[in-house]
Swiss-Prot record:
Belongs to the ZapA family. Type 1 subfamily. GO terms for biological process: division septum assembly; FtsZ-dependent cytokinesis; septin ring assembly. Activator of cell division through the inhibition of FtsZ GTPase activity, therefore promoting FtsZ assembly into bundles of protofilaments necessary for the formation of the division Z ring. It is recruited early at mid-cell but it is not essential for cell division. Residues 21-99 form a coiled coil. The lineage of its organism: Bacteria, Pseudomonadati, Pseudomonadota, Gammaproteobacteria, Enterobacterales. Its main location: cytoplasm. This is Cell division protein ZapA. It is found in: Cytoplasm. Gene3D superfamilies: 1.20.5.50, Cell division protein ZapA protomer, N-terminal domain. The keyword Cytoplasm applies. It comes from Pectobacterium atrosepticum (strain SCRI 1043 / ATCC BAA-672). It holds the Pfam family ZapA.
Length: 109
């Protein structure tokens, strides 16, 4: 489906954005999250300039995203290492099983 205009409120300002209908709930949730972040920043920093608050919130979100990307990379690397170790263990077990089978086969002849 094509994107349709959706009105959202960000920090007391109306904003119309195009959004696919199936993503409208996620957009509304993101707007709520941003509003909460801006409100929290306003209280915590005592900055009253909306533009400054928006930039600070954007920087915070970018920082959080970078941290999560790093965690994802670390997790993926860890999983790749574990998979390699598991593959080696399985291959070693199969080789040993093959050796045992070969030995057992020769004993029965």
């Amino acid at each position: 489906m094509s994107a349709q205009p959706v009105d959202i409120q960000i920090f007391g300002r109306s904003l119309r954005v195009n959004c696919p209908p199936e993503q409208q709930e996620a957009l509304n949730q993101a707007a709520e999250d941003l509003n909460q972040r801006l409100q929290d920043l306003k209280v915590r920093t005592r900055v009253t300039n909306t533009e400054q608050l928006v930039f600070i919130a954007a920087l915070n979100v970018c920082h959080e995203l970078a941290q999560e990307r790093g965690k994802t990379r670390d997790y993926a690397s860890n999983m790749e290492q574990r998979i390699r170790m598991l593959q080696q263990t399985i291959e070693q077990a199969l080789l040993e099983q093959g050796k045992i089978t070969d030995r057992q086969g020769t004993q029965f002849e």
